[in-house]
Amino acid sequence: MSSPRYESLAAIPSYSNTFIGRGHHIHAIHTRLQQADTRLITLLGPGGIGKTRLALRMAEEVQALFRDGILFVPLDAVEEADLLSFYIAQQLNMKSQKQEDWLQAVILSLQEKELLLVLDNLEQIIQSAIQIDQILKHCPKVRILVTSRIVLDLSYEIEYPLDGLSRPNANLFPGPIDLLKFDAIRLFVQKAQASKPSFSLTEANAPHVVQICQKLDGLP
């Protein structure tokens, strides 16, 4: 059976604002992806913690490591586990196949590829782990980066739990310049300036900003 035809990989979604924080995770995951035995990495955490944004930042960071690039597959609208292969095929711009052939078609397309497959919001269809297992078994140069609220429970899965961004102690109020050392504060200022460019961190508003970041537990 010949490999299905596909066009160039879909572009990685991008953001106009600067990525803030997660330096430790970026370094650790980058190092992991340079190791030959790393096949599957899962970014774990509750909704809103920043898993998707970190996955996209990682995709940009490690793009040069993969001869055939990055394939980003958003799964937030998918409700049936059987459709995982179909959505991967869509991002590959593959031509139509019979529904029962999608997994095999994806494997045939990727088996000689050296790429990073990013599966975003996999908790929607966590039962699709068996398909991921098959892709990894038959596509030896494919690595997979998953974002999920739930582990896949595969033997070679490497988990990276995410928590809130760094923030100051609620009882301590250093000056505005020192506060900007904390990722949650820097992100708050960035978002505030996006809607009100004149906003700046001052002695007057700093306690309120710290309080907000604490109440949000450092969530982006």
Located regions from the model:
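Aliphatic-rich helical/repeat scaffold segments used for oligomerization and domain docking
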Residues: M1-P220
